[in-house]
A protein has these predicted regions:
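Conserved catalytic/switch belt of AAA+ P-loop NTPases
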Residues: 1-34, 38-43
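C-terminal alpha-helical "lid" subdomain
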Residues: 48, 52-157
């Protein structure tokens, strides 16, 4: 199939301008890329840009799902767990699925689900969370353990 596409591109009329877009640029065959006169990378987001975009996406989804609570500070701490924050499309899907599959009777369950998705840690250790700079209240949200119990666990040495 690739060779047929390459042959077709080689035989295009010179009067035709072909423009293509993809978010899978790294997966393309180099021979295919050589057929284009220019390749432009639009992924020039800074980490701060991605945080801003994520907050906008979060706000939009929280407005649609009335059972959710807002904790943008914790949301941003969770985003900081990423070495590389995903680009907007993937970020939107991650946020949407965390909210959509959250427990309706737990207003911050989406944050726990988001943390699990980002860190691949379904049951985070309270001491590790504290070492990462999470507050007792944030640890309560992420671990599901009451604040008083979290405090006792953190006081144990």
């Amino acid at each position: 199939a690739t060779s047929a596409v390459l042959k077709g591109m080689d035989n295009l009329n010179d009067q035709i301008v072909m423009i293509a877009t993809t978010n899978l640029f790294d997966s393309f065959d180099k021979a295919l890329l050589r057929r284009f006169d220019a390749c432009i990378d639009f992924n020039r987001y800074s980490r701060e840009d991605l945080h801003d975009i994520a907050e906008i996406v979060l706000r939009d989804f929280l407005n649609k799902f009335k059972h959710t609570g807002r904790n943008v500070r914790l949301f941003n701490k969770i985003l900081d767990e990423f070495n590389n924050i995903p680009y907007p499309g993937e970020l939107k899907n991650l946020i949407k699925s965390s909210i959509a599959f959250s427990k309706p009777d737990d207003e911050f369950d989406y944050l726990k689900r988001l943390y699990t998705a980002v860190t691949n840690t379904p049951n985070p250790d309270v001491k590790e969370l504290q070492a990462k700079g999470y507050t007792v209240r944030e640890i309560e949200i992420l671990s599901g353990i009451s604040k008083s119990h979290v405090s006792r666990l953190l006081q144990e040495v």
